[in-house]
Amino acid sequence: RSISDPNPFLISNIRGTFTLLETVKTTKKRFIQISTDEVYGSLKDQSADESFRFNPSSPYAATKAAAEHLVNSYVLTYDCDCIITRCTNNYGPRQFPEKLIPKTILLAKQNKKIPVYGDGKNIRDWLFVDDHCDAILQALLNGKTGESYNISAGNEVDNLTIVNKILSIMDKPSDLIEFVEDRPGHD
């Protein structure tokens, strides 16, 4: 969505973070910035630790990186108690329907073609939403001011494998898969 219309992401991720930080500056409450591993960009065969250089490849990822820099500036300038978490791909109940897993399920139920970007070999680490929430709570309770924490599940699977597993579970044919041109900014 950020590729076709980045403005809402600029407003929520940068302006929204600024608004929250201004409140934190006066209340001195702990603030946790929920970010994304997308700030690192395409890692190919590498993994990133928290000190890895940012290289966002989409407007969404760039706004999350900008928000992180804003958070860090409030830690240094105003002595705010802030921490940052960067998670991998979440999945679970009430996920946006345009995301890979729910979209695949919805289209397969309707026996419609399922678009898979490129060759489908983009690897993602899949993190169940409840596990992500547990990790956020641990970071909030135990994290150090000014630190960033990567959150992953160690469950790396390429997109094509995910789609094929869903089709198999649903007893649907693999010819529902339609390979489409990779979208710009896809990491």
Task: Spell out what each predicted region is.
Residues 18, 43, 63, 94, ...:
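Gly/Ser/Thr-rich beta-alpha loop segments that engage phosphate groups in nucleotides
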Residues 1, 36-39, 89-95, 121, ...:
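Active-site proximal helix/loop that lines the substrate pocket
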Residues 23, 27, 107, 142:
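Conserved helix-to-beta-strand junction in the class I
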Residues 3-8, 45-49, 97-105, 130-131, ...:
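Short, glycine/charged-enriched secondary-structure capping and boundary segments
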Residues 1-90, 168:
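N-terminal Rossmann-like NAD(P)+-binding domain of SDR-like oxidoreductases, especially those catalyzing
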Residues 4, 12-15, 51, 58, ...:
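Residue-level signal for the nucleotide or nucleotide-sugar donor/cofactor binding architecture
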Residues 15-19, 66-69, 99, 103, ...:
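Active-site phosphate/pyrophosphate-handling residues
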Residues 102, 108-187:
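C-terminal substrate-binding subdomain of Rossmann-fold SDR/epimerase-dehydratase oxidoreductases
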